[in-house]
């Protein structure tokens, strides 16, 4: 290097240099010029010549062999292309540091750039360069490019050299390891391409027809906190790892590529995979594929060279970060297993590197911590050749995983393999140039070794045979025990099955018995119901009153209190009249029933009658009648006599009429001859017929009193109307109720001086009274012990359809209102005095009127009759002769009113005489 000065030059020096030198006489006269001045420069330096090698110096053969044998571990790096969603919306240049953190600088090196999100100071960028890779595959590289550089050397060693080889795919989860190893049907990976290369015969493979290949495939996965081996080509689960071999592993001999490919894809379907947040199809196990070459000939040399040649391909599960995957439970245990296996594998390689650097440092036995490293022990200890292919992702989000893998794998490139398996050939070459003595010594040593090996083999065979025999005995005893237990369990199962069948049969029988019992109970219940019905019918017939459904009474909407009394009198008329006390008790009971049925008193019935002008009243429950009838039957001293079997029915209902009339007819027109009390105490027989215009009446006054006591309508009539009414008032009442039908029914009593007499009013609406009943009644009338029959004759007048109360004529001929149960109205003065001859004349007039023919009446529309009308119609005596059916068809309502008024006037002016005097 020449360094130049920076000072300006001297002008005098320059002039001296420019002026030419003076010669001749002028030169002598002038002074001699000074010596010229020159610049000082550094002298040139010559380099030392390189040392020349000695003419006879050559590298030794041993060092050359060791240098060739010292083959390094090959490490390949493949960068996965970015996924399609990440490519959209980004720059076209893939080297953009903001989006891609890993870039290939050369075929053997890559540059890793820290993303801006990870930098503490964004202004200062940081880039790391990792070199020394055997090859770096860019994202655009194909599967065939990877196969040609990675797998071709291993396949050549297997086919041509008979050497074993191992390919391990490592990398984080989702980096493309499985795709690189297996590929897809359209883009096959390294394993399918290897099988295709093996089973495609070529000219440079002279041993292709003399050997076969065995294919096996298994995986190592986690089981709880442990590990287990699963065969992917069979369903066997009992696989045991013994040193570097797997006991029970199925090896399938394949002859062509199609069979091998079918086995490969069937094993892929059984592989354990799962979805995580980082990868949708994440491998959860370490998958290992082995291809073993087997020689077919009997040549010992070729067999020895090919027996142990195995090509192994391992697809390791990717390391996972818990924060990115979000695994929990079983997936978290699987992540721990995967990360632990990757860590142990890296520790084994680092221990091998340190041991090669320092021979004094022993080799750590990290391979014992994992089942995968135990199986690959020969490769991890440097005795067999191994190749690594690292798969990484270039995205900014994957910077941590990529940097960790590159830092971990960068030292592995310095690992060397001495390849001790192939050193025997080199040793044989050295022996050929050795002395004969050494050769003889070597032969002797070999002979001694072979003899020792034979002895050892014999001893081992003896010990193995002894062990096999003891094991055989043990297994035989175990087999007998298991067979005995199986027989016992079979017999027990049969016995249990028989017992279950018996219990099932018994259960069916019991169910059938229960069903039959239920049917029997149902049939008995039906019989009981039928018997109860029959019992009710018989009880009704025994009590001498018809059932509720046998009584037919037509009424508009409700039943009057008169009907209640009618039913009660009908029932009570069938019993024997023992005494007047019983009659009084009966009248009181009937009065209570009538008050309850008519709205708690006669006032309600009177109001209702005044409003409607008809005989309707509240509905009375027939059950009350039944209860009263039962009490009468039970309280009587004598049993009731059997009544004649005659039914009461209701006449036809006239549709044209607005109101309904109640007419009770007796089917039997002729009654049996009955007995009645006469003047001399004898019995008189009389025949009664409804069609006849005049009927004979009972002359017993006691019977009339009892009939009056038994009819509650008399009480209502006496309470509803005043004691006396004038003729003008009666005419006004008749004019108001012109449309209704009114009748006056006069009950006449005959006075007996000699013996006490009783009277009974026979109701035409009730059942017929037989002759036996009448005879019993006559006997009671003649009984001298009956002290309650009064000797006087009382004539009770009952008005039907009129508001005037009934009157009674005393002994002196005076009239006073009728009383019930000893109760009379406050006004007791006689209305008009009468005499016996007047009574005689009145009786004759009544007989003439009853004997005369009734006038024809027009068919008129009838309304409901008042309570008093219905009561008097029901309690009409036998000596009142009224033909109801003919009167309805012949007479009009106004004519009937006129005739009834005349009869009332005759009765009031001329009281009737005793029938006995007339006779």
From Swiss-Prot:
Origin: domain of life: Eukaryota
Pro residues bias locations: 46-56
Keywords: ATP-binding, Microtubule, Motor protein, Nucleotide-binding
Disulfide bonds: none
Low complexity bias: start-end ranges: 28-45, 685-697
Biased composition annotated in UniProt, kind: Polar residues: 755-764
Alphabetized InterPro entries for the sequence: Kinesin-like_fam, Kinesin_motor_dom, Kinesin_motor_dom_sf, P-loop_NTPase
Compositional bias segments (type: Basic and acidic residues): 597-612, 886-912
Binding site for ATP: 171-178
GO terms for biological process, alphabetical: microtubule-based movement
GO CC, any one term: nucleus
Family named by the database record: Belongs to the TRAFAC class myosin-kinesin ATPase superfamily. Kinesin family. KIN-6 subfamily.
Protein's UniProt name: Kinesin-like protein KIN-6
Source species: Oryza sativa subsp. japonica (Rice)
């Amino acid at each position: 290097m020449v360094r130049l000065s920076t000072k300006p030059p001297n002008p005098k020096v320059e002039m001296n240099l420019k002026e030419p030198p003076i010669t001749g006489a002028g030169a002598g006269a002038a002074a001699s010029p000074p010596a010229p001045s020159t610049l000082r420069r550094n002298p040139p330096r010559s380099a030392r010549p390189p040392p020349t090698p000695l003419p006879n110096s050559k590298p030794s053969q041993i060092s050359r062999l060791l240098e060739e044998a010292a083959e390094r571990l090959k490490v390949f790096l493949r960068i996965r292309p970015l996924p399609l969603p990440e490519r959209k919306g980004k720059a076209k240049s893939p080297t953009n540091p903001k989006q891609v953190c890993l870039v290939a600088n050369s075929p053997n090196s890559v540059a890793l750039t820290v993303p801006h999100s990870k930098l503490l100071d964004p202004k200062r960028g940081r880039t790391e360069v990792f070199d020394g890779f055997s090859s770096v595959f860019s994202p655009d590289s194909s599967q065939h490019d990877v196969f040609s550089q990675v797998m071709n050397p291993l396949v050549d060693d297997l086919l041509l050299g008979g050497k074993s080889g191992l390919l391990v795919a490592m990398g984080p989860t989702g980096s493309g390891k499985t795709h690189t190893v297996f590929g897809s049907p359209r883009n096959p990976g390294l394993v399918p391409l290897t099988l295709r290369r093996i089973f495609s015969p070529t000219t440079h493979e002279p041993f292709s027809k003399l050997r076969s290949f065995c294919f096996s495939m298994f995986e190592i996965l986690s089981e709880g906190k442990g590990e287990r081996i699963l065969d992917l080509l069979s369903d066997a689960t009992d696989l045991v790892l013994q040193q570097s071999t797997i006991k029970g592993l199925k090896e399938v001999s394949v002859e062509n590529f199609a069979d091998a490919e079918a086995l490969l894809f069937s094993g892929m379907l059984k592989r354990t995979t799962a979805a995580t947040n980082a990868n949708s199809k994440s491998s959860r196990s370490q998958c290992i594929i082995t291809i073993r070459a087997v020689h077919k000939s009997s040549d010992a040399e070729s067999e020895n060279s090919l027996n142990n040649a195995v090509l192994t391909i391992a697809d390791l599960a990717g390391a996972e970060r818990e924060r990115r995957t979000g695994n929990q439970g079983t997936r978290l245990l699987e992540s721990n297993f995967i990360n632990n296996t990757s860590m142990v594998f890296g520790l084994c390689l680092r221990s091998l590197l340190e041991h090669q650097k320092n021979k004094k440092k022993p080799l750590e036995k990290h391979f014992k911590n994992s089942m995968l490293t135990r199986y690959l022990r020969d490769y991890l200890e440097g005795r067999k050749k191994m190749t690594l292919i690292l798969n990484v992702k270039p995205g900014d989000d994957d910077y941590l995983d990529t940097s960790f893998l590159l830092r971990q794998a960068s030292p592995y490139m310095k690992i060397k393999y001495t390849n001790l398996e192939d050193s025997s050939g080199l040793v044989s070459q050295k022996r050929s140039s050795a002395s004969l003595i050494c050769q003889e010594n070597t032969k002797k040593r070999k002979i001694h070794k072979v003899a020792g090996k034979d002895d050892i083999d014999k001893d081992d065979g003896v010990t193995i045979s002894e062990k096999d025999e003891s094991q055989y005995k043990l297994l035989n005893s175990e087999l007998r025990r298991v067979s005995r237990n199986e027989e016992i369990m079979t017999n027990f199962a049969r016995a249990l099955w028989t017992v279950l069948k018996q219990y099932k049969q018994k259960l069916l029988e019991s169910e059938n018995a229960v069903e039959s019992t239920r049917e029997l109970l149902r049939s008995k219940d039906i019989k009981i119901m039928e018997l109860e019905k029959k019992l009710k019918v018989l009880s009704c017939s025994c009590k001498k009153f018809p059932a509720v459904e046998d009584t037919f009474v037509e009424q508009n909407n409700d039943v009057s209190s008169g009907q209640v009394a009618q039913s009660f009198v009908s029932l009570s008329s069938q019993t024997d009249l023992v005494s007047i006390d019983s009659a009084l008790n009966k009248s009181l009971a009937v009065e209570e029933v009538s008050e309850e049925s008519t709205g708690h008193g006669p006032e309600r019935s009177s109001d209702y009658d005044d409003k409607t002008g008809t005989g309707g009243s509240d509905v009375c429950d027939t059950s009350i009648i039944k209860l009263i009838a039962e009490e009468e039957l039970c309280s009587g001293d004598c049993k009731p006599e059997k009544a004649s079997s005659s039914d009461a029915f209701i006449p036809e209902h006239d549709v044209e009429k607005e109101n309904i009339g109640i007419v009770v007819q007796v089917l039997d027109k002729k009654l049996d001859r009955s007995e009645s009390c006469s003047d001399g105490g004898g019995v008189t027989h009389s025949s009664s017929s409804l069609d006849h215009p005049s009927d004979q009446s009972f002359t017993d006054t006691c019977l009339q009193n009892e009939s009056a006591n038994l009819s509650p309508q008399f009480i209502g009539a006496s309470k509803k109307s005043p004691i006396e009414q004038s003729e003008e008032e009666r005419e006004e009442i008749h004019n108001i109720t012109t449309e209704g039908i009114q009748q006056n029914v006069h009950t006449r009593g005959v006075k007996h001086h000699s013996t006490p007499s009783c009277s009974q009013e026979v109701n035409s609406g009730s059942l017929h009274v037989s002759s036996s009943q009448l005879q019993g009644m006559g006997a009671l009338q003649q009984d001298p012990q009956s002290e309650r029959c009064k000797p006087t004759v009382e004539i009770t007048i009952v008005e039907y359809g009129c508001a005037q109360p009934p009157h009674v004529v005393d002994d002196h001929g005076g009239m006073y209102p009728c009383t019930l149960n000893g109760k009379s109205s406050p006004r007791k003065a006689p209305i008009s005095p009468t005499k016996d001859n007047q009574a005689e004349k009145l009786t004759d007039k009544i007989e003439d009127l009853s004997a005369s023919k009734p006038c024809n009446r027009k068919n008129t529309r009838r309304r409901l009759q008042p309570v008093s009308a219905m009561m008097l119609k029901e309690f009409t005596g036998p000596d009142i002769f009224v033909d109801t059916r003919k009167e309805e068809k012949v007479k009009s309502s106004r004519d009937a009113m006129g005739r009834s008024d005349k009869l009332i006037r005759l009765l009031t002016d001329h009281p009737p005489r005793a029938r006995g005097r007339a006779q």
